Structures are given as C-alpha cells and as structure tokens.
Design a protein with these regions (language model features):
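Conserved NTP-binding/hydrolysis module of P-loop NTPases
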Residues: 9-14, 87-106
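A short, basic N-terminal segment
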Residues: 1-43, 279-283
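Conserved AAA+ ATPase "SRH/arginine-finger" region at the nucleotide-binding site
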Residues: 82-85, 178-179, 190-204
Length: 283
C-alpha cells in the first residue's frame, strides 16, 4: 500500500510532477498570472518569466494554460513548447507549422516557405477570425540564436493596434542576457518578471495546500509540526521543488517509523542524511 493511503490521503501530496491541481499559488504567482493574462488580453507581444531551478516555472506555465483554456477556449489558440532543443531555423519553423497544424504542400519546405505559411496563419486567425494566438515556450534558455532570431521575426507581424503572436518565454535566469543578442528583441519585451522563492509562512501554506488537495474530503490533515516546517524552510530556502521532495521523504519516514507527526528531529535527520550523501558524491 502506498504511504499516502496509510495516512488517509487519496493522492500523492508531494509528487514532483507539474500537476496544476497541486500548484500552490503564492501572492507572487497570482501577480504573475494576472499580469500575463493582461499582456495576452492586450496583445502586447513578448513577455518573459525567469527564475532559478525549482521555483515552479513549469507548473506555472501549465497553470496558465489551464486558466486560458477554461476562460477563453473559443477565442484563444494556445500552443506550448516544453523543451525547445532546435538548433536551426528551418527545423524550428517546420516544428511550428506542425504545432500550429498548418498544412504544407511541399515535401521539403524551405524556411522561407514555412515562415510564409506561419504569417498566413497569424493573419488569418489573428485578424480575420479575431483570435488571440499564444505561444508559450518553457525552458526558453535552451533556445538557439537562430530560434531567437526566428521569434524576433515572428513578432514583426502586427496590425496598427496589436501584435499577432503573444509570445511567453519562461526559463532560468540565463535567459535574460541571451535575449540581448538578437537585434531589437530585448526592447520588445513588454513584461519582465522574476520568480522568487517562497517565504516561511508561504512554505507552510504550500504544505497544507498540497495535503488538502490530496485528502479525500478536502480537509487539510495536520501532519507537520511548526518546528518541522521551520527546518524545511531553512533547508529549502523556500524553493517549491526542494520543499516537495523533502516533504515526500518526511511522510515516508513518518509511516516507516510509525510516528503521528513530522517533527523537527525527523526533518533534521533527513537533512543530515541528504547532506552526507551530497558530500559523498562530491568527494
């Protein structure tokens, strides 16, 4: 039997999979989503969200997709790229035509042909059908220079009032200096936002939220003592991925040791083991 079933939970509360249902929305996350929705609604073009590893960027992207699909299913065409490992312009453009479900007559279309097809797609849907076309790229720091140049060119397509492509780039901190390389791309960013780690109180709220989401009746079982949460925050520094992994280990230890609550000594023991393992691997 799974450990969470033993604790009376319906689902795994601390899975590292980017499930939007388990995404705790901090005040900052809510602010980012609100500003992105406004930027999309106003069709301002390019928006960027950056953050260190483990700050919840991918889950935020999935949450935005979920919100847009629910609120604007008939008016928004939402496309997402999760791992943009395309080295060449033609390769990237060909993938975009597939993503946008654009039919191409030629068996081996050139980059120019692909770009023309995408241009037609943007004007047909963005102007004639009055749709909002959104392209969200996660792990955007992986974009090659030719891909960034392609995106810069796609942002050129506009009416007198708005951009035809709403581009959201989400990535690690090194994304920002890379956006300065293609000419005029940096100046086109309408929204720049950096995700920070959670505070101590938000760490506690995140833990309780995920337990509530995993419970059978929607209540939040109290399994973590305050001292344990203090240690979790001090060790993870508020990074959601680290919080999730440590809480997962803590609940497994809770069941294996037949304890009632996760307390400070239990968490400290887990942290000590993790630290020794890292030191051993580094040696």
């Amino acid at each position: 039997m799974s450990y969470f079933k033993i604790l009376g939970l319906e689902k795994e509360p601390f899975s590292t999979s980017p499930d939007p249902a388990f995404f705790y929305l901090s005040k900052e996350h809510k602010a980012i989503l609100y500003k992105l929705k406004i930027a999309i609604r106003l069709k301002r073009g390019l928006s960027t969200v950056v953050g260190n590893v483990g700050t919840g960027k991918t889950t935020l992207a999935r949450r935005l997709f979920q919100i847009l699909r629910k609120e604007n299913e008939e008016t928004v065409l939402f496309h997402m790229i999760l791992n943009p490992v395309y080295r060449f312009e033609r390769e990237f453009l060909l993938y975009l035509t597939q993503l946008f479900q654009i039919e191409i007559d030629s068996k081996w279309p050139s980059a120019i042909e692909c770009m023309k097809k995408i241009e037609d797609y943007l004007f047909r849907n963005g102007v004639e059908k009055n749709k909002t076309i959104v392209l969200l790229i996660d792990e955007a720091q992986k974009l090659s220079v030719p891909c960034l140049e392609t995106l810069r060119m796609l942002l050129n397509y506009e009416t007198n009032e708005y951009k035809l492509l709403q581009l959201i780039l989400i990535g690690q901190m090194e994304l920002l200096p890379r956006l300065r390389k293609p000419e005029n791309l940096w100046d086109r960013i309408s929204l720049k936002y950096s995700i920070n780690p959670l505070g101590r109180d938000e760490t506690e709220e995140m833990i309780n939220f995920r337990l509530k989401q995993a419970s059978r009746n929607g209540s939040s079982p109290i399994l973590f003592e305050d001292g344990a949460i203090d240690e979790i925050y001090n060790y993870t520094q508020g990074y959601p991925r680290k919080i999730t992994m440590l809480c997962h280990d803590a609940l497994e230890a809770l069941v294996m040791e037949s304890r009632e609550f996760v307390d400070r000594p239990l968490v400290c023991n887990l942290i000590s083991k993790a630290t020794k393992l890292v030191e051993t691997e580094a040696a």
